Amino acid sequence: VAYKDPEDANKNFEKYGFNNHRFIEKDGAQCYVIWNDTDAIIAFRGTEPKEMSDVKADLNAIQRQGMHNTGDVHGGFQGEINKVWDDLNFTVADIQDRNIHITGHSLGGAMATICAKRLEEEGIHPHCLYTYGSPRVGDRKWVKTLDVTHYRFQNNNDVVCKVPFWMMGYRHHGNNIYI
């Protein structure tokens, strides 16, 4: 749904009982936040090949220090979440009492993973993280300090799940589920 036009997406949200929704977009980085009385979903859009800022983010594999000295993360992925973070964090302040589910595909999966970690560091504990075709996001230290139930869905032939290379210090987080 993160790839849909906001108007079409809103119709789908309401169909499934999520009458509250917010679309956040800045410089190519996008996410939806939808919620009802008990649950909230934060969904991040992945790479759109025609979106140059997405391609630049994917290629910027230089590790940068994560928040609170908890290890290093992919600089490009961190840069993308930084673009939407202020607006997202403002919205999350209103929904933090709900079961927060975070999801994303490809680049969006990486953004979702960083989002889950940042929320934890702010004392908000996501209920669950679901990523699809996500690349590796952080180094061993960063991955070990992420404490959220994470279902990482991956097609064994998807090259995105194999980058950045583990030889560069990157690691996956979560329970891997091959589809």
Region locations from a protein language model:
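Non-catalytic, mobile gating and regulatory segments of ester bond hydrolases
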Residues: 1-103, 107-179
